């Protein structure tokens, strides 16, 4: 059991597992923010723009009694689709920004050696020419 716990500790302390855990926590929080944005800001404004529609209450009655109808709540589904599109777009922008930064790092010109190294290289070359 001790070896198992030690192996688990080593797994958790590796960078990838920690990065994944942080990503999941931040992703969950970001998802809640986007859900609130869609439900509380985006769909009400969109509903007003297309004629005062409340997306949360859009549903088809497919059966049941008038007091307790069976419904397909497609308005909730539309909100989930809006959530997904906004989250996917935000992730796209984030990945695009990260790729741009990585490309700039790769394309940066090589740094010049310090003046001391240049001087020592010149001295070495002079000594090599004189020794021949």
Swiss-Prot record:
Its main location: membrane. The keyword DNA damage does not apply. InterPro entries: MS_channel (IPR001185), MSC/AndL (IPR037673), MscL_channel (IPR036019). It comes from Synechococcus sp. (strain JA-2-3B'a(2-13)) (Cyanobacteria bacterium Yellowstone B-Prime). It is a multi-pass membrane protein. The keyword Transmembrane helix applies. Homopentamer. Pfam families: MscL (PF01741). This is Large-conductance mechanosensitive channel. Channel that opens in response to stretch forces in the membrane lipid bilayer. May participate in the regulation of osmotic pressure changes within the cell. It is found in: Cell inner membrane. Belongs to the MscL family. HAMAP family: MscL. It comes from the Bacteria. Keywords: Cell inner membrane, Cell membrane, Ion channel, Ion transport, Membrane, Transmembrane, Transmembrane helix, Transport. One of its GO terms (cellular component) is plasma membrane. The gene is mscL. GO terms for molecular function: mechanosensitive monoatomic ion channel activity. The chain crosses the membrane at residues 11-31, 75-95.
